[in-house]
């Protein structure tokens, strides 16, 4: 809607990022390469959809998407939404990263960018357990 087109009185940017952005201390894909990088990511997904376990597929897609960081804002939310769509489509529960774990989430992604994906996978699986425990506790109350 038109209301969403403004953010703090400034027109909200549309489309892919126009300026470089940095996540933590890591550079992301340059604006002029975003479209190609996303096409390659989609091709990677299609190629691996039937070969790779859905959990690994979703986590790896999310990691790669965040490395591209195609928009000026909202990349984390969008990336987690896509990751959870992949998980839900395969019968797995979504992964919720709670606000209090935001810094640890950024650190896990940074380590993954350095090639230490085990830390990232472990962190995300811990979030899955927390979400499951929350759902289980909530269900018991009713």
Predicted regions and their residues:
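FIC/Doc superfamily catalytic core
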Residues: 1-73, 77-142
């Amino acid at each position: 809607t038109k209301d969403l087109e403004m953010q703090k009185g400034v027109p909200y940017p549309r489309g892919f990022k126009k300026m470089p952005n940095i996540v933590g201390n890591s550079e992301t894909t340059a604006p002029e390469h975003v479209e190609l990088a996303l096409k390659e990511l989609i091709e990677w997904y299609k190629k691996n959809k039937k070969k790779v376990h859905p959990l690994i597929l979703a986590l790896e897609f999310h990691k790669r998407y965040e490395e591209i960081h195609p928009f000026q804002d909202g990349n984390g939310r969008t990336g987690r939404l896509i990751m959870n769509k992949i998980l839900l489509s395969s019968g797995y529960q979504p992964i919720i990263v709670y606000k209090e774990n935001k810094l640890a989430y950024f650190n896990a992604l940074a380590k993954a960018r350095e090639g230490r994906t085990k830390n990232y996978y472990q962190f995300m699986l811990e979030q899955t357990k927390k979400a499951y425990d929350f759902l289980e506790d909530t269900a018991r109350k009713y």
